[in-house]
Design a protein with these regions (language model features):
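Sec-dependent N-terminal signal peptides
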Residues: 4-13
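Sec/Tat signal peptide C-region and signal peptidase I cleavage site
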Residues: 13-21
Length: 238
């Protein structure tokens, strides 16, 4: 088993910034891999080994039974990930504003992206979060949990579901959610939201199977579009 723990700090003394942005580049292949990364400060990057200073590409993790723990504490941080794994456990924490989370998990069906357990915690505003799970595979038994506290955040999730569960809890104004779940087996999406001026678009399109959706939202000036389609007539939002 491989385990790596990385901690970075950006320090301030007498009001002057002494250290430039931190960048972590990762390319890992093999099973049973654990990685912990913590970055404290602003403008930090986590991505791939072919990145160059100031320009980040997606990190590359290939294998099965992997655990990834990412903590970025500060503003304007960026995490880009290209993960190919079965039995993948991911914990992603972002505390700050204007952060970017851009991850795809097994998009080409190398391992199938089964039995993943993902938790995404966001505290802050103007963050851009994107997760693509098993676009050409089946996210069997996926357990996905989001906790978002802040305003003007954008969350995009695209999942090829197979008995997957997706729980999202949002507290804040002017947030946007775009969720697309398709595949050949049913999935469950539960969204709890508290805030104003929200825009929520949900598409559930399991081919000839059942999908479940529960939305509880409290606030003013909301726009909702819900599409459920099990291979019937094509529909779209106005």
């Amino acid at each position: 088993m491989k385990r790596i723990t990385i901690i970075f700090f950006i320090s301030f003394f007498s009001g002057y910034l002494l250290v430039a942005d931190n960048e972590v580049s990762i390319d890992q292949s093999g099973a049973t891999f654990n990685l912990d990364v913590e970055q404290l400060g602003a403008g930090n990057l986590i991505g791939g080994s072919d990145a160059v200073a100031g320009t980040m590409t997606a990190l590359d993790l290939d294998g099965a039974t992997m655990t990834l723990d990412i903590n970025q504490i500060g503003d304007a941080n960026k995490f880009k990930g290209d993960i190919t794994a079965d039995s993948f456990t991911g914990f992603f924490e972002f505390d700050g504003d204007s952060n970017i989370f851009d991850v795809q998990i097994d998009p080409n069906n190398t391992f199938g992206a089964d039995s993943s357990n993902l938790q995404v915690n966001i505290t802050g505003s103007s963050n851009d979060m994107s997760l693509d799970q098993a676009l050409s595979a089946m996210a069997s038994s996926l357990d996905l949990d989001w906790t978002i506290q802040g305003d003007t955040n954008t969350i995009d999730a695209d999942i090829d579901i197979d008995g997957a569960t997706n729980y999202m809890n949002i507290d804040g104004d002017d947030n946007t959610v775009n969720y697309n779940g398709d595949g050949f087996a049913g999935g469950y999406f539960h969204l709890t939201h508290d805030g104003n001026n929200r825009e929520i678009t949900v598409t559930q399109a399991s081919t000839q199977d059942n999908d479940w959706l529960k939305i509880t939202s409290d606030g003013n000036n909301g726009t909702f579009c819900i599409i459920q389609n099990d291979q019937g007539t094509s529909t779209s939002c106005p």
